[in-house]
Each structure stands twice: as structure tokens, then as C-alpha cells.
């Protein structure tokens, strides 16, 4: 396998997914698989919810054209296919949370039983001894599957954000695996990025606002499930290339946002799944940034946190328990900002006004 072959495959995946996306959006409008504007959604017109379906089609295409071994490929496609199908039904008919959670749990059980993919160890996060989970690992795995799916679902609030954050996660995992010699899994991660990029282009309106699409619950479910699947493949076992604590850094922003928001809702006596406008992108936009600027800032923050995890993985001199402590400190800082969102927004607005005044007051230099 050489870089030319890999590049050709990735370009083929990108082109296939792009063509499929244009086809799928036409079908979606005919069958009513569209997002309608309401008091919480500010877009105009009916937007096809086909981003996730196109990404899944791109991965099916990937597994069909590549000639290298991807572990549990058929099992993954079957499990992911069920989740995408249920997600599409939810996008169309609004299925209850209990039904979706039950199906996600069932898929998680199939993954553990037939793929032997489960959390058996959390690594050395408490010092010099390994935290082996035993039978409790099966229950924690189900929670991890649910958490990953919901974490990526909850960040899908502004254009481009879900795509950007998922690309950061897959890029971080792919880089670690590539340099560790786990080529097939690395290519899978890069193929996910190639399949997501066409969605980002249409979602951001780069090819024109008339072609806009949304990811839908089918897409966020697929992305979250794929992330946790690959992490289980790579963080468990005797010769795992990624430490379990590194996984926290790789999905830091979606994970922090989900935990902070759910905690805030529960404290208010609300359902953890009830919608509100307290997510990180809402905070940044209240500070005066546009939706596009918020997307860029959050994606860069996610890339920074993921880079910390990747560098620590390669350095080998930072203990896993130290990385856990640092992650918890980062999470506490995030929670502080969310809890005092109005203060943070006011501070950012004040800084922006000062910067504008400084730019406006600087003398013009002429030759």
C-alpha cells in the first residue's frame, strides 16, 4: 500500500459521496425526509436530512473498493446500517427517545457479543496499576456507546459543526494509527473524513445555498457509533495503539458539552434530552460571533485538545493519570464558562469592542 493508492481511494470516496449526496437530497424532498423551520430552527425552506445516509453510503463504497483487511467490517456495516435506518425514521417520523435508546443498546450488545468489542480496561488512569473492569466493562461499554452517539448528536446545532468536530476526531485517531502501523484502521478514519467533507461543503452552502443539506439524527448517530467502535478496536487488548484516556481528549468538546448541558438540565429539574440554547455554540454566538465564526472557533478548540492527546500518546513520558487530571481540569474550566455564560459573553464582547476601537484609532500609514 502506497500513498498514491491511498490518495486515489480517498478521492474516489469523496467523489462518490458527493454524487450520492446530490441524488439523495432529491429523493429526500420527494419522501418528506426534510427539516422544517420552527421557533428553534432559523433556516429557511425545507432542508434534506441526508448527510448521514450519504456518509454511510460512502463507507459502504469504501469497504467495497479497498483491498486491505478491516476487522469486523461486515458486523460494523450491519450495526451501523440499523442505526442509520432508525435515525432516518426518527428524522422523518420523530421516534421516541426510549425506542431509540433501546435499539442503540441492542446494537451495542451485538457489537460486544459478536465482535468482542467492549471496555475491559481503562488503563493506568489511577497510577501504576491497571484498572481492569471485569464484567462491569459490558455495562460501561453500553453507556459509552450511548454517550458517544448523544455527544455528537448534541453538538449538531450550527452549520458545519458536527462535520468539523467529527473530522477532528477521525483525523486524530487516524494519525495515531497510521504512525503505529495500523494502516487499515487509519484508512477507515481517513475514509470517514472523505465521506463527511461533501456534507460539510453543502451544509455550509459552499456550492450554493440551494443545495444545503443537514446531517440528521441518522448522521450524528452514525458518527458517534463509528467513533466509539474504532476507539474500542484501538484502546483495548494487550497491544493497543491508543490509551483509553487519550480517547477523552480526542472527543473532548462533544463529550464536555454533553455532560455539562445534561448536568445543567437535571439541576433545573428538566429532562436531560430537552432542547435549550445553552450549548457552547450558543455561548459563542451570544458573545457577538457569527455562526460561521463559532464553527471555526469550536473546531479549532477541538483540534487543540485532540492534539494534546495525540502528543501525549507519542511522548510516552506523561503518565495516563496526569492526562486524566489535566482533562478533568479542562472540563472544569469548560463547565465554569458554561455556568457563567453571560459573564463570559460580556467579557468577550468587551474585548471585541476594545479591539475594534484600537483598530479604528490607529493612524493610517501613507507613502
Curated annotation (Swiss-Prot):
Q: What is the lineage of its organism?
A: Bacteria, Pseudomonadati, Pseudomonadota, Gammaproteobacteria, Enterobacterales
**What family classification does the UniProt entry report for this protein?**
Belongs to the glycosyltransferase 4 family. WecA subfamily.
Q: Which GO terms describe its biological process?
A: cell wall macromolecule biosynthetic process; cell wall organization; enterobacterial common antigen biosynthetic process; lipopolysaccharide biosynthetic process; O antigen biosynthetic process
Q: Its annotated pathway?
A: Bacterial outer membrane biogenesis; LPS O-antigen biosynthesis; Bacterial outer membrane biogenesis; enterobacterial common antigen biosynthesis
One cellular component term (GO) for this entry is: plasma membrane
The record lists the catalysed reaction(s) as: di-trans,octa-cis-undecaprenyl phosphate + UDP-N-acetyl-alpha-D-glucosamine = N-acetyl-alpha-D-glucosaminyl-di-trans,octa-cis-undecaprenyl diphosphate + UMP
Which source organism?
A: Escherichia coli O157:H7
> What EC numbers are recorded for this enzyme?
2.7.8.33
Major subcellular site: membrane
Q: Which Pfam families match?
A: Glycos_transf_4 (PF00953)
* Residues annotated as transmembrane: 3-23, 46-66, 69-89, 132-152, 158-178, 187-207, 213-233, 242-262, 294-314, 318-338
Q: What is this protein called?
A: Undecaprenyl-phosphate alpha-N-acetylglucosaminyl 1-phosphate transferase
The membrane topology noted for this protein in its Swiss-Prot or TrEMBL record is: Multi-pass membrane protein
Function of this protein? Catalyzes the transfer of the GlcNAc-1-phosphate moiety from UDP-GlcNAc onto the carrier lipid undecaprenyl phosphate (C55-P), yielding GlcNAc-pyrophosphoryl-undecaprenyl (GlcNAc-PP-C55).
